[in-house]
């Protein structure tokens, strides 16, 4: 068996080819070293000592337990346990449901997560910042500050109940575009369908990713990568012009300053020089306006950044352009991803 590092590096190298389809992934789950690495990754994280629906925690870990788990994976008798549902308070005072998987399921999910991250990290767009290595809400804000200069309108996107409404069939279809291993796909589907236990009652799951599941964030990014790529193509079609034309007022003031400056260089009379300097400073104050025409219809741009299920679009264009963009995104999300853009919470604001 190859070391986990070599396995993951190999997957990462292949991911750089956008049309590559991964095969024989399921065999990676026979590698005990992958599970040991997974164990090391999750053992110190808060919450992993919390018992799942099977009552076990990571302190009961052993190589024998890993071998038993691999055996169940080999003959595909492995079945994830339903997560134990609990509730945690949100900032607004409401409660958010959280599923606590069994530890064996955490272990398998962590192996899958490492594999998916290696396969997709290079494939993701630079505009995606949530749940990714070396990225955070801070890198998203930095990108907004850097790229959204001169933006006139903002479209703040809100997807209704995103994590609960991820369509399983759509997600599996997206995964199959890059993964040609049916057993690996079946395993992920098992996690999607595992359900949860609340008040000792089992509930099936028909949509959404495993709540509290280790693979949920990466699956969410794979799902919304479709939106990221759609917006990249949309911007390429929308963007117009090389640069904005100069503001006529700014140009006129600049001309006056140049003319007065030329006179100043030729004048030796101190009184006249002082008058010219005063006039130049006065015009310089008037010239504290945008140097370009902000209403230039021949120059348009879109900038887009996403963090998890929140996204923002900066528009250099008209309000009508922003409304069209919002409507196009709404239709794309519904038609392609079976998601609903919140009319109430998706705002268009002036910059």
List the predicted regions and their residue ranges.
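Non-catalytic terminal/accessory segments
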Residues: 1-351
């Amino acid at each position: 068996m190859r070391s986990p590092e070599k396995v993951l590096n190999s997957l990462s190298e292949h991911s750089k080819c956008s049309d590559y389809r991964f095969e024989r992934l399921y065999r990676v789950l026979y590698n005990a070293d992958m599970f040991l690495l997974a164990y090391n990754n999750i053992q110190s994280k808060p919450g992993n000592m919390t018992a799942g629906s099977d009552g076990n925690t990571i302190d009961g870990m052993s190589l024998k337990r890993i071998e038993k788990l691999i055996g169940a994976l080999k003959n595909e008798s492995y079945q994830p346990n339903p997560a134990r549902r609990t509730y945690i308070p949100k900032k607004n005072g409401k409660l958010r449901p959280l599923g606590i998987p069994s530890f064996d399921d955490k272990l398998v999910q962590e192996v899958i997560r490492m594999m998916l991250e290696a396969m997709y990290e290079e494939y993701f767009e630079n505009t995606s910042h949530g749940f990714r290595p070396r990225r955070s809400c801070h890198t998203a804000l930095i990108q907004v500050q850097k790229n959204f200069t001169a933006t006139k309108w903002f479209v703040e996107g809100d997807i209704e109940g995103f994590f609960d409404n991820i369509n399983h069939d759509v997600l599996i279809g997206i995964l199959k575009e890059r993964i040609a291993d049916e057993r690996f796909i079946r395993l992920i589907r098992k996690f999607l369908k595992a359900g949860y236990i609340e008040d000792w009652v089992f509930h099936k799951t028909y949509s959404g990713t495993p709540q509290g599941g280790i693979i949920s964030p990466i699956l969410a990014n794979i799902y919304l990568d479709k939106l990221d790529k759609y917006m990249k193509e949309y911007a390429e079609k929308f963007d117009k012009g090389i640069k904005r034309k100069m503001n006529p007022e700014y140009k006129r003031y600049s001309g006056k300053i140049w003319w007065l400056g030329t006179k100043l260089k030729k004048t030796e009379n101190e009184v006249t020089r002082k008058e010219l300097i005063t006039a130049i400073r006065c015009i310089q104050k008037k010239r504290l306006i945008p140097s370009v025409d902000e209403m230039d219809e021949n120059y348009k741009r879109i900038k887009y950044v996403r963090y998890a299920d929140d996204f923002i679009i900066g528009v250099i264009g008209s309000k009508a352009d922003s409304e069209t963009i919002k409507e196009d995104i709404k239709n794309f999300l519904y038609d392609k991803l079976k998601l609903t853009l919140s009319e109430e919470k998706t705002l268009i604001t002036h910059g």
